[in-house]
């Protein structure tokens, strides 16, 4: 869904992070084409990127961090990369149809559906500190992602910047 929900925009987003074909040593295939891999019990379709679906194997990589719009055991991270990143625009629209209130609850349910019906092999979780520096890296086999990601998120939240006052009075004069 990033990059303006276009294949070209997604490549530009990756390039902004220094992830290029030259850096990787392989082609970057980007498209907005998806495959419906199944439906949830409530009838909601689950989508994944067509290229990823056809790949021999998938390794997800994502920064695990607090989300700005919702809280839960899964926020921004490997599960969200599977659900919204691999789901492309169609997947993002399906997931967001009930608003952010349900997103924290739905991420692990949809991620499990994806893990069970695609060739996701592993995930690489990246955590940052208060200075936006990578300070934690953990690899997880696909069967470990749902169990390990909440603890990884907790550890990244511990490294965020914070104001070290329990009680503070502030006077602002203009």
Segment roles from a protein language model:
Residues 9-73:
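An acidic, phosphate/nucleotide-engaging active-site surface
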Residues 48-173:
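Conserved, well-structured core segments that form the ligand-binding/active-site neighborhood
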């Amino acid at each position: 869904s990033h990059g303006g929900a276009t294949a070209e925009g997604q490549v530009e987003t990756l390039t902004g992070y220094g992830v290029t074909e030259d850096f990787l040593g392989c082609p970057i295939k980007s498209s907005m084409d998806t495959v419906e891999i199944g439906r949830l019990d409530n009838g909601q379709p689950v989508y994944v990127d067509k290229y990823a679906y056809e790949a021999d194997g998938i390794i997800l990589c994502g920064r695990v961090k607090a989300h700005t719009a919702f809280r839960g055991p899964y926020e921004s991270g490997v599960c969200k990369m599977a659900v919204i990143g691999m789901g492309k625009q169609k997947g993002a629209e399906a997931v967001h149809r009930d608003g952010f209130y349900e997103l924290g609850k739905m991420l692990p349910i949809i991620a499990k559906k994806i893990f069970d019906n695609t060739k996701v092999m592993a995930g690489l979780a990246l955590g940052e500190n208060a200075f936006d520096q990578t300070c934690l890296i953990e690899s997880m086999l696909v069967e470990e992602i749902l169990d390990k990601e909440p603890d990884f998120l907790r550890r990244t939240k511990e490294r965020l910047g914070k104001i070290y006052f329990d009680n503070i009075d502030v006077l602002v004069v203009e």
